[in-house]
C-alpha cells in the first residue's frame, strides 16, 4: 500500500506516489483541470491512480499564508479534501505546503530547465515535496516511538 501526494491548484493537480515502503516520493503526473469549479474528471483520474497504485492514504497540500492564517486557497483545499474523502473513502491529511512551489521553481531553475518543461513539471515536483515532507514526518515519528520504548 502507498500514499498519494497532491498539489491542488486552480488549473492543475500535481500527483506524487510513495514507494511501497513509504520512504520516498515520486512524481507521476499533472492532471489538467478543465475548470476550477468542475471536479468530476479530476476526481475520476485520481480514483484511477488510487486503484493503479494501491493507495491507502492521501496527503493534500494545504497552502496556509506565511503568517499561518487560512486564506481562500486553503479553504478551497479543505473543500477538495472533503470531496476526496467522500469520493474515495480514504483518509486525507492536509499538509502545510508553504513554499513548495517556490522550492520546485528553484530546483528547476538550478537545473536550467526550459520554461515549457518547467510549466509541465512544477506541480508534479511540488506534489513530491509535499509527500516527501509527510513521509519524513512519519519516519521521524516512528523513530521517536522506538526511542521512547527503550
Swiss-Prot record:
GO terms for cellular component: cytosol. It holds the Pfam family RuvX. Its EC number is 3.1.-.-. One of its GO terms (molecular function) is nuclease activity. Keywords: Cytoplasm, Hydrolase, Nuclease, Ribosome biogenesis. It is found in: Cytoplasm. One of its GO terms (biological process) is rRNA 5'-end processing. Could be a nuclease involved in processing of the 5'-end of pre-16S rRNA. Belongs to the YqgF nuclease family. This is Putative pre-16S rRNA nuclease. It comes from Lachnoclostridium phytofermentans (strain ATCC 700394 / DSM 18823 / ISDg) (Clostridium phytofermentans).
Amino acid at each position: 500500500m502507498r500514499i498519494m501526494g497532491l498539489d491542488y491548484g486552480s488549473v492543475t493537480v500535481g500527483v506524487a506516489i510513495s514507494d511501497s515502503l513509504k520512504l520516498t516520493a515520486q512524481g507521476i503526473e499533472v492532471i489538467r483541470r478543465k475548470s476550477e469549479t468542475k471536479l468530476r474528471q479530476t476526481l475520476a483520474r485520481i480514483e484511477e491512480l488510487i486503484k493503479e497504485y494501491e493507495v491507502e492514504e492521501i496527503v493534500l497540500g494545504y497552502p496556509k499564508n506565511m503568517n499561518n492564517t487560512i486564506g481562500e486557497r486553503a479553504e478551497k483545499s479543505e473543500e477538495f479534501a472533503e470531496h476526496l474523502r467522500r469520493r474515495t473513502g480514504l483518509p486525507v491529511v492536509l499538509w502545510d505546503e508553504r513554499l513548495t512551489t517556490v522550492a520546485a521553481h528553484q530546483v528547476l531553475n538550478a537545473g536550467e530547465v526550459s520554461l515549457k518543461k518547467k510549466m509541465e513539471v512544477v506541480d508534479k515536483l511540488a506534489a513530491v515535496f509535499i509527500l516527501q515532507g509527510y513521509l519524513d514526518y512519519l519516519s521521524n515519528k516512528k523513530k521517536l516511538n522506538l526511542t521512547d520504548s527503550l
